[in-house]
Structure formats: structure tokens, C-alpha cells
Amino acid sequence: MPRADGRAAGDLRPLALERGANPYAEGSCLVRMGGTLVLCTASVEAGVPGWRKGTGQGWVTAEYAMLPRATTERTPRERQGAGGRTHEIQRLIGRSARAALRGFDFGEHTIRLDCDVLQADGGTRTAAVSGAAVALADACVRLAGSAGVKNPFERLVAAVSVGIVDGEPRLDLCYAEDKVAEVDANVVVAEPDGLVEVQGTGEHGTFARAQLDRMLDLALAGTARIFAAQRSALGW
């Protein structure tokens, strides 16, 4: 069955990365993937979590939130603390960002990534990972210059959703596809093709190894295109 937006199974949605969207942050990126829009900022802060103190090493962590009207109906703000889904997503973003570093030898500083969804049409967590990597790259340059340490940023990290809809493996699901997918997965990749994380769920039963392999092939091809866009945004 054709996709609603006319894309082929292996096509990404239109992708745009606006580096430096927030001039106050040490690093920032406004990422648009189709109808999904996420603002990612990276802030360098003095100090580290308590368990990290005295080690001389830094840390990278992430927070994620959705604006109330990022979705078709208003969602209340999480004023009582992050819910389970939010915790899961921000931990994913943090793990992915740390995979971009060569290590944490940049003194007791924390780089905090804030990923705020302005508009959601599927793939918000994967868009956040890809945008956060651009913001992190710039923040690491700023930190290295101010702290007199080697730039800890080593490689780009990108993420994309894949799934099976109407029996067909597809790349970069929009919300309309995501909500009816037989299989829904998110894949995080460190450049060029190192798997950082694979999250996959059979929503209505099981799926075959061959289908998983096809989804991974789609994800690796998709993240290769995202890496190219990240490099272009960073001027590399």
C-alpha cells in the first residue's frame, strides 16, 4: 500500500537542521523531520552529579519535554515531574549523546541537553537524538576552549524510526503510520554504522529475523543521510 505522503518505503521525510537556533546556549539545533519539530540545546554547567564528584571527570545528561500543543490535542505539562515515557526518552537521548564522546576527561562539568518538542508527528525521540548531537558538538568545542581540555566529541550520532506497516518495512514513520504499525522500532547509530541502541516492539504479534534485518538496513541507510545533513549543518 502506498504511503500517505507518497514516499517510498526507504525514504526519509524532509529533514532540516538549523544549527545555532538558540544564541544563548553553548550549542543548539532546531531539527525538523517532516511534521516533527524539536529544539535541542546544550548547556555547559559547572559541577557534576554527586556520584561523579572528586573524579575530575565530566558528565552528559538529557531532558526531554513536549509543549502542551505539540500534538493535535493539548497535553498538560508534567508539573509533578517527568512521567515514565519521558524518563525513558531522556535516558535514551543521554545514552546516545554519551556514545558521541571519546571519554569524559573534560573536568567536572556537566553538559545538559534539553530537547523540547514544538510539534509532534512521530519520531520525536529520534529527531531529538539527531539534533542533540549537533548541539553537543558545538558545546564540546566551547567547553574545550574555555576549560583548556581536548575536545571530547569524537563522532556523530543519529537516530531514526523504522517499522512494519501493512506488512512492509518502512523508514521514518509519521504518526499516522506509527499508530497502526505492526512493528515499531527506533535505531540509534554512531557514525558510520555502529549500533548504539535498537528498540523494537511487535505491536500485534511477532516479527521475523528477516524483517528485523530489513529494518536495520533501512535504518543504516537513513542515518547515513542524517549524518550528511549533520555534517553540512556543522560545516564539516
Show which residues each predicted segment covers:
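Buried hydrophobic packing segments
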Residues: 40, 93, 97, 128-140
